[in-house]
Curated annotation (Swiss-Prot):
<dbReference type="GO" id="GO:0034274">
    <property type="term" value="C:Atg12-Atg5-Atg16 complex"/>
</dbReference>
<dbReference type="GO" id="GO:0000045">
    <property type="term" value="P:autophagosome assembly"/>
</dbReference>
<dbReference type="GO" id="GO:0000423">
    <property type="term" value="P:mitophagy"/>
</dbReference>
<dbReference type="GO" id="GO:0006995">
    <property type="term" value="P:cellular response to nitrogen starvation"/>
</dbReference>
<dbReference type="GO" id="GO:0008047">
    <property type="term" value="F:enzyme activator activity"/>
</dbReference>
<comment type="function">
    <text>Involved in cytoplasm to vacuole transport (Cvt) and autophagic vesicle formation. Autophagy is essential for maintenance of amino acid levels and protein synthesis under nitrogen starvation. Required for selective autophagic degradation of the nucleus (nucleophagy). Also required for mitophagy, which eliminates defective or superfluous mitochondria in order to fulfill cellular energy requirements and prevent excess ROS production.</text>
</comment>
<comment type="subunit">
    <text>Conjugated with ATG12. The ATG5-ATG12 conjugate forms a complex with several units of ATG16. The ATG12-ATG5 conjugate also associates with ATG3.</text>
</comment>
<dbReference type="Pfam" id="PF20638">
    <property type="entry name" value="ATG5_UblA"/>
</dbReference>
<dbReference type="GO" id="GO:0005776">
    <property type="term" value="C:autophagosome"/>
</dbReference>
<keyword id="KW-0472">Membrane</keyword>
<dbReference type="InterPro" id="IPR042527">
    <property type="entry name" value="Atg5_UblA_dom_sf"/>
</dbReference>
<protein>
    <recommendedName>
        <fullName>Autophagy protein 5</fullName>
    </recommendedName>
</protein>
<dbReference type="GO" id="GO:0051365">
    <property type="term" value="P:cellular response to potassium ion starvation"/>
</dbReference>
<keyword id="KW-0832">Ubl conjugation</keyword>
<comment type="similarity">
    <text>Belongs to the ATG5 family.</text>
</comment>
<dbReference type="GO" id="GO:0034045">
    <property type="term" value="C:phagophore assembly site membrane"/>
</dbReference>
<keyword id="KW-0813">Transport</keyword>
């Protein structure tokens, strides 16, 4: 199982970051406004903000680290996107709303998104539901650790396991994300995980035709059961809208997942670096209800 986890851990995406002209002084070279980077699927976009600021610092029209009157966020095709989801999760959802797929997800994304294209913008106020990009170097770490507290509680019924980590273990845990140390990550995360979870930390994301994300976090009990995805289809899909499993593909970590997959097996193998299992629902061509409602 660790072989699968390490493949996911080592997975990377091409990310093209374009900088809004409002950040730069007049006369700045056009090429300075575009940055191409390779980013792990299992990280946050904001972890690369120091790299972005460093590239454009000589051409900035203001100091973003001290300006408290401006808010910064990312967009894709003029739609705000949250930095607080793993990069791979964002890619899966953005690829999913770029087309309606008729063949395998893996083949289609090659044509739809060669790069994860994001735009760094700023404004006097934030779009709804978007967490601003802060100058604090600990912003991502604090958010990520809070995610793991939630995960620990969902799995075990309490946060005792993660709160019992020593200061050095907690630093080592986050450090494993920054330095890409897989062994350290597995060592610490296994202390939090449970072989007999009470519930599964699950987040479902779907792209609406408006370009916004629909996020749900169903509560899936695992007490005495180990359901398949098909068994919990009603929790995964918005059945009130008449959508069923024939209308959508289930995508996790860029992989198309069959409905007969056991939920605990899926969680054990494909959970993300923040402890949650992210499932992306992608409309299938011919699924009229999915195409109109998602």
């Amino acid at each position: 199982m660790n072989d699968i986890k390490q493949l996911l851990w080592n997975g990377e995406l091409n990310v093209l970051v374009s900088i809004d002209p409002s950040f730069l002084m007049k006369g700045s070279p056009r090429e300075i406004a575009v940055l191409r980077i390779r980013v792990p699927r299992e990280t946050y976009l904001v972890n690369y903000m120091p790299l972005i600021w460093n590239k454009i610092k000589s051409f900035l029209s203001f100091d973003p680290l001290t300006d408290s009157e401006k808010y910064f966020w990312f967009e894709h095709n003029k739609t705000p996107i949250p930095w607080n989801y793993p990069v791979g999760v964002l890619f899966d959802c953005l690829a999913g709303k770029s087309a309606t797929f008729t063949t395998s997800f893996e083949n289609q994304v090659k044509d739809v998104l060669t790069f994860l294209r994001i735009h760094l913008v700023m404004g006097d106020s934030l779009p709804p539901t978007i967490i601003p990009i802060a100058s604090s170097k600990t912003q991502a770490e604090k958010f990520w650790f809070h995610q793991w507290k939630q995960v620990c509680f969902i799995l075990n019924g309490s946060s005792k396991a993660i709160m019992s980590l020593s200061v050095n273990e907690a630093r080592k845990f986050w450090g494993s994300v920054i330095t890409r140390n897989f062994q350290d990550f597995i060592e610490i995360s296994n202390k939090i995980s449970s072989s007999r979870p009470r519930h599964i930390p699950l987040i479902i994301q779907t792209s609406r035709t408006s370009g916004t994300f629909r996020i749900s976090q169903p509560t899936i009990s695992m007490t005495g059961v180990n359901p398949t995805l098909k068994d919990i289809e009603g929790d995964i899909l918005d059945v009130k809208e008449g959508i069923n499993g024939n209308d959508v593909m289930v995508i996790c970590q860029g992989i198309e997942i069959p409905w007969h997959m056991l939920l605990y097996d899926l969680y054990s193998k494909l959970r993300s670096f923040d402890g949650f299992l992210y499932i992306t629902l992608v409309p299938i061509k011919g699924g009229d209800k999915a195409s109109s409602e998602l």
